[in-house]
Amino acid sequence: MGPKYVFITAIIGVFWHVQGFPNPGIKQDKAVHNRELSEERPLEEQIAEADTVSRGTSKENQEMLKNDSFADELGLLMSVAEKEGDVKRSGSVRSSVGGHRGTLDDADSTKNLKPAEYFDSTKSMLDYKYEDDPDGLHQLDGTPLTAEDIVRKIATRIYEENDRGVFDKIVSKLLNLGLITESQAYTLEDEVAEVLQQLIANEAKNREKEAGDLDYAAVRSDVYDDDKQEGKMETRNKNEDRESSETKNEDSFSSKERRNELSPEEDFDDLQYFPNFNRLIKSLNSENDAKEKKTLITIMKTLIDFVKMMVKYGTITPEEGVNYLENLDAMIAVQAKNKLGKSFGSHKSILSEDKNVDESDSTKQEAAKMEKEYEALKDSTKPEPKDAEDKDKPKGKAETYLEAIRKNIEWLKEHNKEGNKGVSDNDLSKLKDFINQQADSYVEKGILDKEEANVIKRIYSSL
């Protein structure tokens, strides 16, 4: 009987402390109380209540995650194992639970309300695309992420930020939390490195493909333009052939005209030191004399270069070279006067004013001597030009000047530093080689025509 009484006493003690339904502490009007139970509250009150609840629940999470930029990756890796393990188990239950939840949510209108952050325009709408997946464990189509997807996501993050420190921070936190071991960390590093290398290779291929597409488009555009113009070009072939022949003739004429338009000062810098030669060039001012003037300038320059070469090799002294060039200019005046019938001034105007009287006399004597030698060696069978037209022919001027060059070479032989022994065959060979090189260079530069160069070569080869 003792235990029976004890059991009855315990039951009475339990029911003694049981309370009934609570009564309102404050007396309310019966109509207000019934309205709260039967009618839905105003929308403003529901929004305010939902806002208060949302702020209270998310405040602690925001405090914990605001200083950690990699919280999404950590949360993703920490919960991926549990998520993947429960996917199959929760697949069948989700439909029934979802349907039941939908019924409850429909009954409670506060469940459909969005948090205050949802209406904030500064936040991305992607953050609320999957509200039941805060860790980003689902893809865009809603399917859960696999381990390969997680590795690819980490590799993509490293590739976009171009920083390997992202992986180091994630692995160090996983190791500190004890979620992975060191061997798993090495395996994860190898997998991420492989995916990262594949991303880089794909990016390189895409760039090459884009560059190839641009080149192909440019080539196709050129081909299209060529095909478009081909029909027009065929109709104008005959006209272009005729125009091309005319253009060639005009180009040939313009090139010669352009060379003739060059002033003597541009072609011959040392012209100022030869006043008689300068007068001779200025006298050839007609169109027929343009080619002759160019030839004379070229020959004079070649002769000066030859004198410089002789001085360089020591064949003559610098004083003898200067004397030779002065007598050359004086002889030009004398022979031009005799052959062409033109006076280029007295010998006093030819020589420089800085020369003394003795130097002027010696120059005059030398010029007179050379004139006598020329008269003695002159071909007596050749008739003298009598008509003014014959005197003004370019051919006569060229022959006169070339004969003067021969006489100057003979004078150079006699005034060699070795006395009257003359110039050796070696010197003449050097002279011929030098003249040939100069003539070829003038042809390449466009100063002389090929025919003019051949004439000069032929003259010096006959010395």
Swiss-Prot record:
Spell out the Pfam families in the cross-references: SGIII
InterPro entries per UniProt: SCG3
Classify the main location. Answer: cytoplasm
Domain of life per record: Eukaryota
Which residue positions does the secretion signal occupy?
1-20
Where located? Cytoplasmic vesicle, Secretory vesicle; Cytoplasmic vesicle, Secretory vesicle membrane; Secreted
Region Disordered: start and end of each range? Answer: 87-111, 225-267, 353-398
**Where does this protein have compositionally biased stretches of type Basic and acidic residues?**
102-111, 229-262
Q: How does it sit in the membrane?
A: Peripheral membrane protein
User: Which GO terms of the cellular component aspect does the record hold?
Assistant: extracellular region; transport vesicle membrane
Sorted keywords for this record are: Cleavage on pair of basic residues, Cytoplasmic vesicle, Membrane, Secreted, Signal
Subunit: Interacts with CHGA. Interacts with secretogranin II/SCG2. Interacts (via C-terminus) with CPE.
What is this protein for, i.e. what is its function? Answer: Member of the granin protein family that regulates the biogenesis of secretory granules. Acts as a sorting receptor for intragranular proteins including chromogranin A/CHGA. May also play a role in angiogenesis. Promotes endothelial proliferation, migration and tube formation through MEK/ERK signaling pathway.
Query: PANTHER family, per this entry?
Result: SECRETOGRANIN III, SECRETOGRANIN-3
- Name of the protein in its database record: Secretogranin-3
UniProt source species:
Xenopus tropicalis
